[in-house]
């Protein structure tokens, strides 16, 4: 029912400011999840089990971080058939993010530009929301740094968030690739990344001993990397035994949307224009990593065939964001069925 109604809902939502529509959708999904209405209206999604990072996934199609930054609608999203859910990015302290307007649709290109800036209610409220959810499937918790934390102290924020979310996460994503927090992408540099991952792995080992379980770490990287940078990141992942990598975040490139309304807005571009760049990074990572580190592919998936292409490039799992906004819940089932066909 959601799938058949979504085109009508989208027509109304797309007449609204993009961020207002986003918040309205979150409130509706949150309410639907709490009342059980989402389950009653959701499309049938077949099981297509996968085991990745030592975790059992109902199917390989997940929700990407960013749609539910505070973990307020986990049950609503889960009812739509996703094989796993990732929420965040969360920071140690609540922060408002960048000034509005900060989210722009480019429907001619099936794209979105956002410069949200890790707006969130802080890790304490985030953990409360996660604990309140009834969902018991694979749940990724995505962590970042506060905007006013100097980049030299970024590790402190990641370590603090890791400690807070660890008991409640199936896996934890280290987001160092958002273009909307000043200097954040510097952490992708070889020296900076080596130091950060060393600290996080040490913390992970101590938390595993404390809680009696090893929660995998995944690193989320940008599409705007040259071959040498991808090689350096891959080598660092292997050196520190990082359990997963998510490729990719949004792009700063505007090559594919030149001349379109809002194309010159600052921020990260997501959607169809990032599809090829994301796949290229996935292929390069797979060549460097072999089968040692699984890849979660995200960026520009608008069809089942797009999801299959991500897996063909080397991903073990995929995530949806902008395609889900444009296509709605039907895209989840379409991707799962296409992947299950092989």
Swiss-Prot record:
EC number(s) from the headed UniProt entry: 1.3.5.2
EC class (word): oxidoreductase
Gene Ontology cellular-component terms listed: cytoplasm; plasma membrane
Gene3D superfamilies: Aldolase class I
GO biological process: 'de novo' pyrimidine nucleobase biosynthetic process; 'de novo' UMP biosynthetic process
Chain positions recorded as FMN binding sites: 65-69, 89, 142, 175, 220, 248, 271, 300, 321-322
Protein family according to the UniProt entry: Belongs to the dihydroorotate dehydrogenase family. Type 2 subfamily.
Protein name: Dihydroorotate dehydrogenase (quinone)
């Amino acid at each position: 029912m959601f799938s058949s109604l979504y085109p009508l809902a989208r027509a109304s939502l797309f007449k609204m400011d993009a961020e207002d529509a986003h918040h309205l959708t979150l409130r509706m999904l949150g309410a639907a999840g709490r009342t059980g209405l989402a389950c009653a209206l959701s499309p049938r999604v077949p099981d297509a089990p996968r085991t990745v990072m030592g975790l059992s996934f109902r199917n390989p199609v997940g929700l990407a971080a960013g749609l539910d930054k505070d973990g307020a609608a986990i049950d609503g999203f889960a009812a739509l058939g996703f094989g796993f859910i990732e929420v965040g990015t969360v920071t140690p302290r609540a922060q408002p993010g960048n000034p509005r307007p900060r989210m722009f649709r480019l429907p001619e290109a099936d794209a979105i530009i956002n410069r949200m800036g890790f707006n969130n209610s802080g890790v304490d409220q985030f953990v409360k929301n996660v604990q309140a959810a009834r969902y018991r499937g694979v749940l990724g918790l995505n962590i970042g740094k506060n905007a006013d934390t100097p980049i030299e102290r970024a590790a402190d924020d990641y370590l603090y968030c890791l400690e807070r979310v660890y008991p409640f996460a199936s896996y934890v994503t280290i987001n160092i690739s958002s273009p909307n927090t000043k200097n954040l992408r510097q952490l992708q540099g070889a020296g900076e990344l080596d130091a950060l991952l060393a600290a996080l792995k040490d913390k992970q080992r101590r938390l595993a001993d404390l809680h009696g379980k090893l929660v995998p770490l995944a690193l989320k990287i940008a599409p705007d990397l040259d071959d040498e940078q991808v090689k350096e990141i891959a080598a660092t992942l292997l050196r520190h035994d990082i359990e997963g990598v998510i490729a990719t975040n949004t792009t700063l490139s505007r090559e594919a949307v030149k001349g379109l309304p809002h194309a010159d807005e600052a921020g990260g571009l997501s959607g169809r224009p990032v599809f090829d760049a994301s796949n290229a990074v996935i292929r390069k990572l797979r060549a460097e990593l072999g089968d040692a580190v699984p890849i979660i592919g995200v960026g520009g998936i608008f069809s089942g065939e797009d999801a299959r292409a991500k897996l063909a490039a080397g991903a073990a799992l995929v995530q949806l964001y902008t395609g889900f906004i444009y296509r709605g819940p039907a895209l989840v089932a379409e991707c799962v069925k296409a992947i299950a066909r092989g």
